[in-house]
């Protein structure tokens, strides 16, 4: 049996997961990151994407996150998400509404270049996430 560690997934709305797990795959800003027990201490930002959690029981569950931070220690991982839901509760239609809202905000045109770049990056990440959900 693989070594296990404590994993917490927290959003401002609620605590989604606080369990013993064997593996977590997170959408770090610089690419997908697999966290296992005894991982080197790391802190990273999270982009919109899927978090895949493999519980000590062997069960796997996915969550959709919309940005945040992950604090990784050898004994545990805490993911503080700006917003998060179970992937079972996130439909492609709901995500499409977020994409449409991001497009509308970009089209308003009253943005400084730096803010516009962030909006475009966010739209790109949401679009990629939508493609992942539709394919799943």
From Swiss-Prot:
Subunit note: F-type ATPases have 2 components, CF(1) - the catalytic core - and CF(0) - the membrane proton channel. CF(1) has five subunits: alpha(3), beta(3), gamma(1), delta(1), epsilon(1). CF(0) has three main subunits: a, b and c.
Can you quote a single GO CC term? plasma membrane
Recorded name of the encoding gene: atpC
The way it spans or sits in the membrane comes to: Peripheral membrane protein
Where, per UniProt, does this protein localize?
Cell inner membrane
Q: Which Gene3D superfamilies match?
A: F0F1 ATP synthase delta/epsilon subunit, N-terminal (2.60.15.10)
Instruction: Outline what the protein does.
Output: Produces ATP from ADP in the presence of a proton gradient across the membrane.
| Recorded family membership | Belongs to the ATPase epsilon chain family.
Q: Name one GO molecular function term.
A: proton-transporting ATP synthase activity, rotational mechanism
Report the CDD domains cross-referenced here. Answer: F1-ATPase_delta
In Swiss-Prot or TrEMBL terms, this protein is called ATP synthase epsilon chain
The main location class comes to membrane
**Which keywords are on file for this protein?**
ATP synthesis, Cell inner membrane, Cell membrane, CF(1), Hydrogen ion transport, Ion transport, Membrane, Transport
Species source reads Agrobacterium fabrum (strain C58 / ATCC 33970)
């Amino acid at each position: 049996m693989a070594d296990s560690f404590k994993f917490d997934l927290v959003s401002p709305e609620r605590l989604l997961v606080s369990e013993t797990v064997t593996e977590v795959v997170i959408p770090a800003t610089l690419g997908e990151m697999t966290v296992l027990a005894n991982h080197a201490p790391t802190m990273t930002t999270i982009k919109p994407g899927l978090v895949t959690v493999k519980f000590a029981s062997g069960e796997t569950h996915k969550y959709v996150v919309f940005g945040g931070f992950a604090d990784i220690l050898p004994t545990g991982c805490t993911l503080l998400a700006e917003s998060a839901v179970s992937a079972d509760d996130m439909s492609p239609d709901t995500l499409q509404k977020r994409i449409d809202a991001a497009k509308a905000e970009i089209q308003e045109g009253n943005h400084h270049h730096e803010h516009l770049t962030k909006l475009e990056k966010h739209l790109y990440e949401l679009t990629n996430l939508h493609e992942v959900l539709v394919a799943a």
